[in-house]
Amino acid sequence: MADPKYADLPGIARNEPDVYETSDLPEDDQAEFDAEELTSTSVEHIIVNPNAAYDKFKDKRVGTKGLDFSDRIGKTKRTGYESGEYEMLGEGLGVKETPQQKYQRLLHEVQELTTEVEKIKTTVKESATEEKLTPVLLAKQLAALKQQLVASHLEKLLGPDAAINLTDPDGALAKRLLLQLEATKNSKGGSGGKTTGTPPDSSLVTYELHSRPEQDKFSQAAKVAELEKRLTELETAVRCDQDAQNPLSAGLQGACLMETVELLQAKVSALDLAVLDQVEARLQSVLGKVNEIAKHKASVEDADTQSKVHQLYETIQRWSPIASTLPELVQRLVTIKQLHEQAMQFGQLLTHLDTTQQMIANSLKDNTTLLTQVQTTMRENLATVEGNFASIDERMKKLGK
């Protein structure tokens, strides 16, 4: 409300809120700039539909598992968001892939793997030292896998509405067949969506039924394996560990859950009141026998102890005279050991002397043989020299005449 002293002044608006006006902005701030529109052909104008964008990203969330945007310094590389041509469903979102999404994801992954293998084949040469899974073999396997995916005929079987109907393929296919039959009856001559060709009779419709018994067997085997796994986990949870000290746990390591339940039921039935009196009487008799056995065992143990003590005493008595002579025997053994060592050394010296004597004898024989040869050679040379001197004397005599 306005101040009461201004209530009677002319030009005052009554029963209205107070308005406080400010002065205009400076001239520099009052300038208005017209935004120029970009008319260049190099700039691409994108028309954004907010409603379509909202519907596309509705109920979507960004997975931050394993991401690190911190500025810490370390050897490990920081991991940020990664995106590709085809975005898969993230883990932990609580959304299950539909068969159509699985089919598209498998086709996309096979295509990427095929591209990578083609790049490897152009750079890597085949050799005998390669690994078992060569790029050529891997490419063949990829082609077979892609052919198997294409052979599933998912798109042909369910049409463009597969993304909706593939959550229940059998039900969707049955509904589509019924709709086509109704349309055929109404049109009388129209062909169904699954006809392989135009039949001779326009009132007939031919359908192809693609049966995959291997897939059915695999699904059945997977269900059986899952059931066996759950049953094994249940048996493991119910089964108790074997304890040798606890007689109640004896025999509870059964092969299956039924055997364990039967054993537990038998043990529980043994605790009935009608049976406990009989069990108590038997336990009393067994306890008396156990006490008698304990007394007898104590007497037997005492007798065994006394016999062992007597044996030890006799052994000590026999050992006393031997113990007195043991130091002398040890001294003699030490002396004999030294004598044996000296005798061994003397034997080695004799062996060396004998070997040296044999070497000297062999040398003497060789020298004798050489001396004989030298003497023979000297005699021959002396005879030759004497003959030469005689011939020289004869020549001198002849020359003197």
Swiss-Prot record:
It is found in: Cytoplasm, Cytoskeleton, Microtubule organizing center, Centrosome; Membrane; Cytoplasm, Cytoskeleton. GO terms for biological process: melanosome transport; mitotic metaphase chromosome alignment; mitotic spindle organization; protein localization to centrosome. Residues 1-25 are annotated as: Disordered. Residues 99-132, 214-244, 379-399 form a coiled coil. GO terms for cellular component: centrosome; cytoplasm; cytosol; dynactin complex; dynein complex; extracellular exosome; growth cone; kinetochore. Keywords: Acetylation, Coiled coil, Cytoplasm, Cytoskeleton, Dynein, Membrane, Microtubule, Phosphoprotein. The modification Phosphoserine is found at residues 83, 320. The modification Phosphotyrosine is found at residues 6, 86. Part of the dynactin complex that activates the molecular motor dynein for ultra-processive transport along microtubules. In the dynactin soulder domain, binds the ACTR1A filament and acts as a molecular ruler to determine the length. Modulates cytoplasmic dynein binding to an organelle, and plays a role in prometaphase chromosome alignment and spindle organization during mitosis. Involved in anchoring microtubules to centrosomes. May play a role in synapse formation during brain development. This is Dynactin subunit 2. It comes from Homo sapiens.
